[in-house]
Amino acid sequence: MMLQGAGLGYRRDLAEDFLLLPDNSVVNFMEVAPENWIKMGGAARYKFDQAAERFPLAVHGLSLSLGGQAPLDKALLQGIKALMTQYQAVFFSEHLSYCECDGHLYDLLPMPFTEEAVKHVAQRIREVQDFLGMQISLENTSYYLHSPTSTMNEVEFLNAIAQEANCGIHLDVNNIYVNGVNHGLLNPYVFLDHVDVSRVNYIHIAGHDEEHGAANPISPSDEAFNKIKGEYRHLPQLLVDTHGEAVKSNVWDLLEYAYQRLPHIPPTLLERDFNFPPFAELYAEVEHIAQLQQKHAKLTVENRHAA
């Protein structure tokens, strides 16, 4: 089933809330990490099956380690393919990272932004696409260490891999913001100005934790981030992509800017992994996504007619 509109990540803690949603809710689809469900059974799987009968499913991988050196895990790929076939899922994305090195590392570690890494990751993406028999999408990740060997910036790296592998781009707006603030290398708005919008087919939005005080808002006119390539600038705060907080206003603003830049409005999902508030608060955030989508879809149509 095709994805559209606003969605919410399915978590076991939210199972009952998903099942209680009315048919006309603003939650149009749900997303799962396949690693959590390939071998899951019992009551948790029964509730998941009930939810999957009602909501189209996006599948977002955690462990393929597209940037890793070890051969791709064919057993995991087979499990992903079987899960997607069972639930008629038509969308799969994975992180631009690696998570194994002589063993599983249980974290998503960043790649050096180099031409060699572009070729390496793109080849592995092509292998995944051949195995699954479909185009996948690549998500930009948050990272906390910038490689000194990088020869390009983050958005150039993402675009180059997507073009080389002929894959989609899964845009994580919160990750763009977190990286922009933490590293001071790339204005989040400039990232969106340069991303290959023709390949963006899915969006994530989430909350982050401010470890050392609130971050100052970043805007397109911020001179400190004006150039697409810049020098490292130490910042007094650290943002951590936790998925455990409400979406910050700065990130909502960035999502709106993304919608303005894109030629279409992609399906957009709210991520929340822990520290769950009352479900009404999560629902309100999904509702806000839907409202922004409707607003900018209307503006896109009006602009086309004006042209």
UniProtKB/Swiss-Prot annotation:
Concerning Pfam families, the annotation shows: MbnB_TglH_ChrH
- Recorded superkingdom: Bacteria
Q: Which residues form the signal peptide?
A: none
The protein's matches in HAMAP family, at most eight in alphabetical order, are given as: UPF0276 (MF_00697)
Annotated NCBIfam families: PRK05409.1
Which protein family is named in the record? Belongs to the UPF0276 family.
- Per its record, how is this protein called by name? UPF0276 protein PM0211
Q: Which organism is it from?
A: Pasteurella multocida (strain Pm70)
The top of its lineage is: Bacteria, Pseudomonadati, Pseudomonadota, Gammaproteobacteria, Pasteurellales
